[in-house]
């Protein structure tokens, strides 16, 4: 049998190492822990990268997918570190990175009618392994925000809009996505729901009006809650208000390493 040439293993004379190289945006089924139903199946977008020494021309792209296929029945949070270790071993790398983004669904009940519906939240698992394993959980929570300035100035109501609060965490003890969402969505003027009847719409509108928030208020309130959570060691929080009376958005961000304070 003729030996196939391995172009990736050939030498590169430019002497430039690459920090991250690999495959991006793979659509793949995964299983996520669900607080109420134990497990939830969803479909993720996955990125897999390793470093590449300066003397190699390229990495072996097919091996990333082979590793993913080897874990096809068991791609979950507790497999992040083993997958990263396998990436390092199979690709001869000193560092590996795995990014998993997926929709996660939580059943919510409307605030007055109690009507049930599913809300979608975009979540991320970001893991890396060099000498040590590092993991960051990310969740994006939609809320309603109502402008305090508009309320103060206007005789008839105030402008309001949907907002996104994005939190990323490092932690020492397991945190349920459901608990994180419930904690963070209280920092907006009002939570949002997929299904609202008329009595619910009245409640949400009036609640937001009585609870106006600037984007600055939102990130500060989230920060207070995350600082008070004993399991969280590092976090970043971003808030973006999709302004209903402007072409642009309003934005604020805070990052804290609790080990440094």
Curated annotation (Swiss-Prot):
InterPro entries per UniProt: GTP_cyclohydrolase_FolE2 (IPR022838), GTP_cyclohydrolase_FolE2/MptA (IPR003801)
Superkingdom to which the source organism belongs: Bacteria
Pathway: Cofactor biosynthesis; 7,8-dihydroneopterin triphosphate biosynthesis; 7,8-dihydroneopterin triphosphate from GTP: step 1/1
Presence of keyword Hydrolase: yes
GO function term, MF aspect, one: GTP cyclohydrolase I activity
Coiled coil: none
Keywords: Hydrolase
GO biological process: tetrahydrofolate biosynthetic process
Site annotation May be catalytically important: residues: 147
Keyword presence, Hydrolase: yes
Pfam families attached to this UniProt entry: GCHY-1
Primary role: Converts GTP to 7,8-dihydroneopterin triphosphate.
The family this protein is said to belong to: Belongs to the GTP cyclohydrolase IV family.
Protein name: GTP cyclohydrolase FolE2
Species classification: Bacteria, Pseudomonadati, Thermodesulfobacteriota, Desulfuromonadia, Geobacterales
């Amino acid at each position: 049998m003729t030996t196939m040439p391995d172009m990736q293993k050939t030498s590169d004379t430019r002497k430039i190492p690459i920090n991250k190289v690999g495959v991006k945006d793979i659509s793949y089924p995964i299983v996520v822990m669900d607080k109420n139903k134990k497990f939830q199946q969803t479909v993720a977008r996955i990125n897999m990268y390793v470093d590449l020494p300066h003397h190699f021309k390229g990495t072996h792209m097919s091996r990333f997918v082979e590793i993913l296929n080897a874990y096809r029945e068991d791609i979950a949070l507790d497999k992040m570190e083993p997958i990263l270790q396998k990436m390092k071993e199979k690709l001869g790398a000193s560092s590996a990175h795995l990014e998993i983004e997926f929709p996660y669904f939580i059943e919510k009940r409307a605030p007055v009618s109690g009507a049930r519906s599913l809300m979608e939240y975009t979540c991320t698992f970001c893991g890396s392994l060099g000498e040590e394993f590092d993991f960051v959980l990310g969740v994006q929570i939609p809320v309603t925000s109502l402008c305090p300035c508009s309320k103060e100035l206007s005789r008839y109501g105030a402008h309001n809009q949907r907002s996104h609060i994005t939190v990323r965490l490092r932690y020492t003890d397991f945190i349920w996505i459901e608990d994180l969402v419930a904690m963070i969505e209280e920092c907006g003027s009002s939570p949002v729901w997929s299904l609202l009847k008329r009595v619910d719409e009245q409640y949400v509108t009036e609640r937001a009006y009585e609870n106006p928030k600037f984007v600055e208020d939102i990130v500060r309130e989230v920060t207070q809650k995350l600082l008070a959570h004993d399991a969280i060691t590092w976090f970043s929080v971003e808030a973006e208000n999709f302004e209903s009376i402007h072409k642009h958005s309003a934005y604020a961000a805070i990052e804290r390493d609790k080990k440094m304070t």
